[in-house]
């Protein structure tokens, strides 16, 4: 039996090609997650598309919890706002 994500996730997953961020967003995400890649959007897309990703929506934002990271995406513009390590 295949594992399907909940319908709430479908909107974000169907629109991964629209995912983008700003120059400042790239810098912020790299700093917050200690990333050593310039393809921050590609990195985020891969994380969001993972079967382990837990995607929730609260108001205007999607929150993706994966590998002790939280990625925040604007639900209307598909802009990656920020990403940070999950606080324990």
Residue positions per predicted region:
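Ribonuclease/tRNase effector modules and their secretory precursors
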Residues: 1-88
């Amino acid at each position: 039996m295949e594992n399907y994500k909940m319908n709430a996730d479908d909107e974000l997953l169907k629109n991964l090609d629209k995912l983008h961020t700003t120059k400042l967003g790239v810098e912020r995400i790299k700093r917050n997650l200690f990333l050593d890649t310039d393809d921050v959007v590609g990195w985020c897309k891969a994380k969001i598309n993972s079967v382990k990703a837990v995607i929730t929506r609260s108001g205007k934002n999607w929150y993706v919890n994966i590998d002790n990271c939280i990625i925040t995406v604007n639900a209307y513009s598909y802009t990656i706002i920020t990403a940070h390590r999950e606080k324990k």
